[in-house]
Structure formats: C-alpha cells, structure tokens
Amino acid sequence: MKICRLISVCVALTCLSFAAYAQGKPTPKDAVLYFVWPQDGTTIKGGFWCRFGLRNMGVTHAGDNYQNSGHHHLLIDVNEPLDPNEPIAQDKSHLHFGAGQTEARIELPPGKHTLQLVLGDAGHYPFKPPVVSDKITVRIK
C-alpha cells in the first residue's frame, strides 16, 4: 500500500515538473528571430518561399526538448498578442513547422498581409521572454 502511494506521488511530481518545464522555457537574451525573405514591404506575384532566420538559438523538431532550441511558427494576419501561458494555435493563420523547417512555400490571396515568426518550445509554447520576429507586411499581386 505504501509503495503504491509512493509511486503515485512520484508520477504526479514528474508530470508536474515536466509541464512546468515545457511551458515557457527561458531564452538567451541575445536570441534573434527574423525573416531572411521576404523583406518588409515586398510585393510578390503569386506564391513565394518564406525563409526564416534564427541567431543564438537552435532549430529542432517539435517534441524535442533541447536547451536553447525550438521550432518556427508563422503568424499570418494575426493581430492579437500571444498568450505566453497557452500553446501557439494551429490554424490557417498560425502555421507550425514542427519538423524543424527553416523555409516554406506560402500561398496567400492577393492583397496586403502581415507575417510574423514565433519560436515555440517542444510543446508549442512561446519561450519566456518570447522569441519573435518583427512583423512585416507583404503585398500579393
């Protein structure tokens, strides 16, 4: 009976510590996330390759819990701030690149669009403080 309780307590503590670790891991102060291409104000005909840049941190797969590394998320036309205590949404405006991609082919309808990169940890949570790019605007013809 005591062994069962001890095992239950150990399992509960392990789960709680993993949840706390996975949400909002700290980041190096000099981490920089940016767009290699396109640049702010670019006018593009049709689909385009979006290339992501990251300095002073590493890129890894979603689910991999390596120190100072994460994976990219591309926010398209998102105006609401991210909640650092919630995982980054996954929908047509929040694209996940959990295989460690550093570029992606993007198709957007004609018009003006905003793009922003966010680095997520193993559980898709933003780091603390968040590692985000500047928001850029592109025009699709």
Regions found by a protein language model. Give the residues of each.
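Short beta-strand elements
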Residues: 129-141
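Short, compositionally biased P/S/T/A/G/V-rich stretches that sit at domain boundaries
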Residues: 24-45
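Short acidic/polar inter-strand loop motif in beta-rich domains
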Residues: 81-83, 120-128
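A glycine-anchored, Pro-Gly-centered beta-turn/N-cap motif
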Residues: 46, 109-111
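Short coil-to-beta strand junction motifs in C2/discoidin
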Residues: 64-72, 132
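N-terminal signal peptide c-region/cleavage motif recognized by signal peptidases
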Residues: 17-19
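Short amphipathic, basic-aromatic surface patches that mediate peripheral association
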Residues: 53-64
